[in-house]
């Protein structure tokens, strides 16, 4: 009996719709699994719920009635990753010792295709894209899933069983895994993030660790040797360990020495030939090389991608040059570490556009990275904190505007030729935008309006 056939005996409650919940409910229903959906949004305002109801799926909207567990004899709960574990339905499932999944676990049960699981506090999307592009260039059957694009359960449901499924994984998604076993796992780094969700760093690290906790001796775990937290988390892994380091040569893995990138002491490419901007991306590149080499990828494919790939949209993305000013969109930088790495990528005079949702952070940790910042344009809930930061650093041009759209011309007006104008907010976007992509698109459009 395969993993999916076993699910046919279960009664599944899908909690929260969004993209992943809708996909999970639809796929389970198509496979003949008894599925019920519960979503907080009222039915009459809830188009996804209406569509699922039309398919014949039981939908309960507008509240979270605990009677569902008895009425539907629920045996598995699949929750939207963003729903906190304090939710009454999740708490009831845990009280009843019912497994709580995210759709990543469901995806694992839907296919025999091997997974490559990529997680970390920063760099996930860039690294996931590099891995996908390298394997694709090597003519290997490869799919990409998770936070980066298509919902993982949809990708898995349509997989043939012999493709690599390259999957970007958040801590939210990994918390809801029970048996998920990637063939190759990767933790890029660990930095304090999402503590409003996980409450403690220990719980956050425990979620990240689940990317390799179920791996076997014939699986691969790729480890950042420069991050003590990652090294410690990997100690209990049964998988074969492959390391990468930007600081020192490593025997089993990837490293940089004398201006060149090596894997297992074999020269891959000179650093000067890599087009991806920023020293911080060297970590992502080394990690990607470790993964794809263990997937059988050729050096030619790796070199081709590294000499042509200029960055992922919203991740230190080069937008345009206008009157000798270069504009970069780093809207994905939703925490301090990501923005510090973006600032480290430039030695030119820089005007920083920053601000957003206030999660209680102070931004003093940015100070060592702001030596090239000549001006700041700030917006959102954290704007007063950034104004204070700029004043403390003696930055001459510090301006508070309403939004990103206003920030772009304000930055241009104080800029000079050869300056970098960088959107790297160091904050989530949810105070003013639905997503960081929406914020980044506003920046790009505002840049184009300068022409």
From Swiss-Prot:
MF terms in GO: ATP binding; UDP-N-acetylmuramoylalanine-D-glutamate ligase activity
- Primary localization class, coarse: cytoplasm
Protein name, per record:
UDP-N-acetylmuramoylalanine--D-glutamate ligase
Keywords annotated in UniProt: ATP-binding, Cell cycle, Cell division, Cell shape, Cell wall biogenesis/degradation, Cytoplasm, Ligase, Nucleotide-binding, Peptidoglycan synthesis
Which pathway, per its entry?
Cell wall biogenesis; peptidoglycan biosynthesis
UniProt catalytic activity: UDP-N-acetyl-alpha-D-muramoyl-L-alanine + D-glutamate + ATP = UDP-N-acetyl-alpha-D-muramoyl-L-alanyl-D-glutamate + ADP + phosphate + H(+)
- Where in or outside the cell? Cytoplasm
What single Pfam family name could you report for this chain, choosing any that match? MurD-like_N
């Amino acid at each position: 009996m395969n993993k999916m056939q076993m699910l046919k005996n279960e009664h599944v409650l899908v909690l929260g719709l969004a993209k992943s919940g809708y996909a999970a409910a639809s796929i389970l229903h198509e496979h003949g699994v008894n599925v019920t959906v519960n979503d907080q949004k009222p039915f009459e305002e809830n188009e996804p719920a209406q569509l699922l109801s039309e398919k014949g799926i039981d939908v309960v909207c507008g509240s979270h009635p605990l009677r569902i567990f008895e009425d539907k004899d629920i045996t598995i709960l699949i929750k939207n990753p963003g729903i906190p574990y304090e939710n009454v339905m999740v708490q009831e499932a845990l009280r009843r010792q019912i497994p709580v999944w995210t759709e990543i676990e469901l995806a694992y049960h839907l296919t025999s295709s091997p997974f490559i699981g990529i997680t970390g506090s920063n760099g996930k999307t860039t690294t996931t894209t590099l891995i996908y592009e390298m394997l694709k260039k090597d003519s290997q059957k490869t799919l990409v899933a998770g936070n980066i694009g298509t919902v993982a359960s949809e990708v898995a449901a349509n997989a043939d069983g012999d493709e690599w499924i390259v999957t970007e994984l958040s801590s939210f998604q990994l918390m809801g895994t029970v048996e998920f076993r990637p063939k190759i796992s990767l933790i890029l780094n660990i930095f304090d993030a999402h503590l409003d969700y996980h409450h403690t760093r220990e719980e956050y690290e425990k979620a990240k660790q689940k990317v390799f906790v179920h791996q076997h001796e014939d699986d691969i775990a790729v480890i950042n040797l420069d991050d003590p937290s990652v090294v410690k988390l990997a100690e209990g892994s049964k998988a074969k360990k492959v390391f990468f380091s930007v600081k020192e040569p490593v025997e089993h893995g990837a490293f940089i020495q004398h201006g060149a990138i090596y894997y297992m002491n074999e020269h891959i490419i000179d650093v000067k030939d890599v087009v991806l901007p920023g020293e911080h991306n060297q970590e992502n590149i080394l990690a990607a090389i470790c993964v794809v080499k263990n997937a059988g990828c050729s050096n030619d494919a790796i070199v081709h991608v590294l000499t042509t790939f200029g960055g992922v949209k919203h991740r230190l993305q080069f937008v345009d040059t206008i009157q000798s000013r270069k504009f970069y969109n780093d809207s994905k930088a939703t925490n301090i570490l990501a923005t510090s790495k973006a600032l480290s990528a430039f030695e030119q005079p820089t005007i920083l556009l920053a601000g957003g949702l206030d999660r209680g952070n102070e931004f003093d940790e940015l100070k060592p990275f702001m030596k090239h910042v000549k001006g700041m344009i700030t917006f959102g809930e954290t704007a007063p904190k950034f104004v204070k930061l700029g004043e403390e650093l003696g930055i001459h041009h510090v301006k508070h505007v309403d939004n990103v759209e206003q920030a772009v011309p304000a930055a241009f007006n104080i800029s000079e030729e050869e300056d970098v104008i960088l959107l790297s907010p160091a904050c989530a976007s949810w105070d003013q935008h639905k997503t960081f992509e929406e914020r980044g698109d506003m920046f790009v459009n505002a840049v184009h309006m300068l022409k």
